């Protein structure tokens, strides 16, 4: 890649197809219930995204978990059922559940487990009622406040890492 002076700044990178950025809702607090309209490819991330429309008719993009289908309902809030694609506070999620799009600070939006095929497992909830322990895909264990949100399920496109690019030109198209 080259900067405004024409000099190489990112070596061995360049070209690539033009991309339109899709604004993905990582907070999941702007709507309570929505219906999945479509599952779409996003050139800006490794996972697929789902286009959902809420009860007011406003469309949003969310990270698509594995097994989410067109027509499914997704909800967010403290009292929603444990179903794939639903976003809940960690205090409402049972121990042993696979979650993704995990917040680190309440209200900041999901920061962990957003890449294709990733998830964290809720290992335990602290007896003091303040923190939950989550094991990430890297086997790292993190303490996260119980009032942080997480989405049920595994992020879509788990085969992303096994895709064979097969030629230099395709790698260039993908800006890799």
Locate each region found by the language model.
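Basic, glycine/proline-rich low-complexity segments that contact nucleic acids
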Residues: 1-45, 66-176
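Structural recognition of beta-strand segments within beta-rich domains
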Residues: 44, 52-54
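Beta-strand/loop nucleic-acid-binding surfaces
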Residues: 57-69
């Amino acid at each position: 890649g080259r900067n405004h002076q024409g000099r190489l700044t990112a070596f061995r990178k360049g070209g690539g197809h033009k991309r339109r950025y899709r604004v993905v809702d990582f907070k999941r607090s702007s709507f309570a219930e929505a219906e999945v309209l479509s599952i779409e490819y996003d050139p800006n991330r490794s996972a697929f995204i789902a286009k959902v429309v809420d009860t007011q008719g406003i469309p949003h993009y969310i990270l698509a978990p594995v097994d989410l289908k067109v027509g499914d309902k997704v909800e967010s809030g403290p009292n929603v059922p444990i179903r794939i694609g639903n976003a809940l506070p960690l205090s409402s999620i049972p121990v042993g559940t696979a979650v993704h799009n995990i917040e680190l600070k309440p209200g900041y939006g999901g920061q962990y487990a957003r890449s294709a095929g990733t998830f964290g497992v809720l290992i335990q909830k602290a007896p003091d009622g303040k923190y939950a322990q989550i094991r990430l895909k890297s086997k790292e264990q993190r303490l996260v406040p119980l009032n942080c949100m997480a989405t049920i399920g595994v992020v879509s496109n788990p085969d992303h890492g096994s895709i064979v690019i097969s030629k230099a030109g395709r790698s260039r198209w993908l800006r890799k």
